[in-house]
Amino acid sequence: MANKKLLVVGARGIVGRSTIKHFSKLKGWDLVGLSRSASDFDSEIEWINVDLQSSADCRNKLKSLNDVSHICYSAVFEKENLTSGWAQSDHAEINLSMLRNVIESMDKNSSKLEHITLMQGTKAYGGHLGPFKMPARETDSRSMGPNFYYDQMDWLSEFQKTKQWNWTILRPQLVFGVAARSPLNIIAAIGTYASISRELDIPLRFPGGVERIGEATDARLIARAVEWVGHNKIAANQIYNVTNGDVYIWHHIWPRVAELFGMEHGVPQPMSLVRLMPENALLWGRITKKYSLKNFSLSDLVPSWRFADYMFGYGQRPNPHHMSNIKIRKHGFSDCIDTEEMVLELLREMQELRILPR
């Protein structure tokens, strides 16, 4: 029997990288990574550099992929101002065109196409606008304003109606994983902030707001969910929330992070990382040389500290976002991960990869 072939779109991102790592260990799968830039991690898969915003580039670069059976789409366009860009109409338009360019090309090229997994998140419930009904369920009504999740879902479901393949939408919470140059990588933000604090000989102080309960999703869990939805008929044309299965409070995780880096844990001190951290770019360069780390600049690892401020709740009132996992569990996917242990595991992995100092 011929192998299945998975096309990972957004292959250098947190979800893409974890999906490639997971499927590389499975028998019967060939992989293709799709990204604007060359791979920045070790893998032996086929890799295609393509501008997803260009329909012509997608047609030309993807025309040889005539045997793709599955697609995991996790690519996203973000503006420099990040959170404020989420409510702008051109942000939605660009993200829709990227998806459309890939799917239209692959639908034309590959007669073997079976399934497409599309990544979303809590913006589907208006999480970027403020509090929403909790726990959020897949059947909840939409929120107001431009939202590329809605545009992508509407287009994909309409386009698929006359096709033989099907789709599944996964909605994780805050995604944790290992990747460079991702504007939404909170692990890199935690690790570089801790490393710089240690180098300055100051305690590790939580820089965000008051205590609040949060949820997270490990990118490794998402990769396993991508595998599950891809071969279970019950998941055809369905939307699923997917989280680790527990909750966390940043203030409880911080002492464990301090212990991992061998430093003192200090009392919380609210501060804007957007304002303070870029000033440490030269110091980070000295840290990379001192500990013989891979040559990533601070802006490579954390392109946007605005996301860290947002997720740590700096200058915000507590705004918990909780989603129900009941649907995906009832349908047969019951995997889970301990969030506090996950944070430490991923930081250790970045240390082992010589991205962060030990």
List each language-model region with its residue ranges.
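Conserved Rossmann-fold NAD(P)-dependent oxidoreductase catalytic core, especially the SDR/UDP-sugar
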Residues: 70-75, 83-148
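N-terminal Rossmann NAD(P)H-binding glycine-rich loop of SDR-like oxidoreductase domains
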Residues: 3-28
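Active-site beta-alpha turn of Rossmann-fold NAD(P)-dependent dehydrogenases/reductases
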Residues: 10, 75, 117-120, 171-173, ...
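NAD(P)H-binding glycine-rich loop region in Rossmannoid oxidoreductase-like domains
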Residues: 39-97, 101
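Conserved glycine-rich Rossmann-like NAD(P)H-binding loop of the short-chain dehydrogenase/reductase
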Residues: 27-40
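Short-chain dehydrogenase/reductase
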Residues: 51, 88-96, 134-135, 142-154, ...
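Mid/C-terminal beta-alpha module of Rossmann-like enzyme folds, strongest
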Residues: 223-312, 316, 324-326, 330, ...
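NAD(P)-dependent short-chain dehydrogenase/reductase
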Residues: 158, 162-224, 257
